[in-house]
Curated annotation (Swiss-Prot):
SUPFAM superfamilies: PEBP-like
Disulfide bonding pattern of the chain: none
Entry protein name: Protein MOTHER of FT and TFL1 homolog 2
Purpose of the protein: May form complexes with phosphorylated ligands by interfering with kinases and their effectors.
PANTHER family hit by this protein: PHOSPHATIDYLETHANOLAMINE-BINDING PROTEIN (PTHR11362), PROTEIN MOTHER OF FT AND TFL1 HOMOLOG 2 (PTHR11362:SF42)
Gene: MFT2
Family: Belongs to the phosphatidylethanolamine-binding protein family.
Induction, as annotated: Induced by abscisic acid (ABA).
Organism expressing this protein natively: Oryza sativa subsp. japonica
């Protein structure tokens, strides 16, 4: 457990985004051929499209994936914590997020100031979410992963990974 949870404690993901949990599902994520590992740096331009998120688990089990930025609009003043970037529900175990249903459309990282953390949190669902049972959040700023999970009775996360991103310098022409 420690090798999975320690980077999340050091990165302040546990505490600021999720509570302490025991990982029970394997989750991998990649932007193109770049694997995401806890704390790695991903350029915003490399993350314009959703990452490929693969999960283990039994095919009959269903999962919810949430991606947020707890550092919006800036790490020194995260007044929009957490900014919601993506929600996918009803992901069958043993597949990837593209097999689920996108509840909130993916929005790539767009950090303006400082280094931002982007957190992918996976929850096991108790049952399939049917059309109309889930209402998308009214707004992306000030989303609360814990509150969403509690409201939908998702319990503690089954897997979490986070990466960092910062604003890319503008190309200068001379």
């Amino acid at each position: 457990m420690a090798r999975f949870v320690d980077p999340l404690v050091v990165g302040r993901v546990i505490g600021e985004v999720v509570d302490l949990f025991v990982p029970s599902i394997s989750m991998t994520a990649a932007y193109g051929d770049r694997d995401i590992s806890n704390g790695c740096l991903v350029r915003p331009s490399a993350a314009d499209y959703p990452p490929l998120v693969r999960i283990s688990g039994r095919r009959n089990d269903l999962y919810t994936l949430i991606m947020t930025d707890p550092d919006a609009p800036s790490p020194s003043d995260p007044s929009m914590r957490e900014f919601l970037h993506w929600i996918v529900v009803n992901i069958p175990g043993g597949t990837d997020a593209s097999k689920g249903e996108e509840m909130v459309e993916y929005m790539g990282p767009r950090p303006t100031v400082g280094i931002h953390r982007y957190v992918l949190v996976l929850y096991e669902q108790k049952a399939r979410f049917v059309d109309g049972a889930l209402m998308p959040p009214a707004d992306r700023p000030n989303f609360n992963t814990r509150a969403f999970a509690a409201y939908h009775q998702l319990g503690l996360p089954t897997a979490v990974v986070h990466f960092n991103s910062q604003r890319e310098p503008a190309n200068r022409r001379r």
